[in-house]
A protein has these predicted regions:
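Substrate-binding/access-modulating region of protease and related hydrolase catalytic domains
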Residues: 1-48, 74-77, 92-102, 106-108, ...
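Structural recognition of the beta-strand scaffold that forms the well-ordered cores
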Residues: 22, 27-31, 53-56, 81-84, ...
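Acidic, glycine-rich active-site loops and adjacent beta-strand->loop/helix elements
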Residues: 32-36, 58-61, 88, 135-140
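Secreted peptidase-domain scaffold signal
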Residues: 33, 158-164
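Flexible, small-residue-rich helix->loop connector segments that border functional cores
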Residues: 37, 60, 72-77, 118-124, ...
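Structural recognition of alpha->loop->beta junctions
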Residues: 44-60
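Internal glycine-rich alpha/beta core junctions
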Residues: 68-88
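Hydrolase catalytic cores
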Residues: 86-148, 152, 156, 160
Length: 164
């Protein structure tokens, strides 16, 4: 069983492997986990890894989804990094019909798509530069916390900051 002190990004194999991928120049985007309403509450591996984007879930009004896991890491890093819609997310069901679903696993691909678009628009930037842009474009970037992280990113703002 994992203890709080083990959530340092170096204990769990998944976290170490995610950090390795990030160190090789990949952008790893992962969900924070859905333990926010339980007794554990904390971001689960590999969400505690260094140099990755860990995504929590919010409502369409920007309020924290009650199930969204929170940080911080054992070594004091802010997690989740950012948040995206994960409560009543519009998703395609296995039957091909649109439906609603809940989870940080739905917030994460939304963020992944936005990050991919930003990197495509700014191909000369490194993975770590893109991650920093995403964080700094968040609506809570001035005062990040362990609930919303850097907040809801504005990737148009992030893109525009590279065009100056």
């Amino acid at each position: 069983e994992m203890c709080i002190r083990d959530r340092n990004g170096h204990y769990a194999l998944m976290s170490r492997e995610a950090a390795k991928a990030a160190d090789k120049g990949m952008i790893v985007v992962c969900s924070a986990g859905n333990s926010g309403a339980g007794s554990w509450k904390k971001v689960t591996p590999p969400g505690d890894a260094e140099n990755i984007i860990t995504v929590g879930a919010v409502t369409k009004r920007g309020e924290l989804a009650p199930f969204s896991s929170v940080g911080n890491t054992a070594d004091g890093r802010v997690k989740p990094d950012v948040v995206a819609v994960g409560l009543n997310s519009d998703v395609m069901g296995t039957d091909g019909n649109l439906r609603r679903a809940n989870g940080t696993s739905f917030a994460s691909p939304i963020m992944c798509g936005m990050v991919a678009c930003l990197w495509q628009a700014c191909p000369k930037l490194t993975a770590k530069q893109i991650i920093d842009l995403v964080r700094q474009s968040g609506d809570r970037a001035d005062f990040p916390d362990n609930i919303y992280g850097y907040g809801i990113p504005d990737l148009w703002k992030a893109y525009q900051s590279t065009q100056r």
